[in-house]
């Protein structure tokens, strides 16, 4: 997935992946 413009926490990144 492409990196979002807003810095998301690692927990959010894990959920996104």
Curated annotation (Swiss-Prot):
It holds the Pfam family MGTL. The keyword DNA repair does not apply. Coiled coil: none annotated. One of its GO terms (biological process) is transcriptional attenuation by ribosome. Keywords: Leader peptide. It comes from the Bacteria. Belongs to the MgtL family. Makes mgtA transcription sensitive to intracellular proline levels. Under low levels of proline this protein cannot be fully translated, and a stem loop forms which permits transcription of the downstream mgtA gene. This is mgtA leader peptide. It comes from Escherichia coli (strain K12).
